[in-house]
Amino acid sequence: GAHDTRHLADPSAAVAEMARVVRPGGRVSLIDTDWSTFAIDVGDDEIAAMVRNAMRTERGRPSNVGRRLHDLAHHAGLAPVARAEATQTWTRWNPDETPAPDGCFSMQSLADDLVATDQLAPAERDRFVSKIHQAARRDQFSMQLTMYAVVAAQPPA
């Protein structure tokens, strides 16, 4: 199986290689997020837009690969057997108790990524994190992200 194909420069080549090495009748499972489905509300439209844009571009990699898994498997010659999608929602989070919503990245690591990709000035890092933490304390924090999964089979020989 594969997860995090979005971190690859060419996800279609990776899936094609999986199809090449799986035996006839064998299966490949693929699961990944699709950052184009990412939604965030922190009571500040400017910060929300900055976060959405950063997550969707993901350092120039194909961050929307999740929704494309079915097509990638099909184009690699695999026969899709099953597909599913699930949306994770984060709403309740106390930044004074944990650095990140359960099962999610921390806002500090997000800010570090934004600085590393020149989408946030280093001098703005603390203010950015503070605004998101303040929104969470006011119960104005919510995020959603959809993951996609595909199981595909190599046709029998």
Predicted features along the sequence, with ranges:
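A short glycine-rich, Lys/Arg-flanked "PGG" loop and its adjoining helix->strand segment in the class I
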Residues: 12-27
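Core SAM-dependent methyltransferase catalytic element
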Residues: 76-79, 96, 145-157
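C-terminal helical/coil "lid" or tail adjacent to the Rossmann-like core of SAM-dependent
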Residues: 82-143
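A short SAM/SAH-binding and catalytic strip from SAM-dependent methyltransferases
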Residues: 1-12
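Conserved catalytic/acceptor-binding region of the Class I
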Residues: 27-95
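Amphipathic alpha-helical interaction segments
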Residues: 67-71, 127, 147
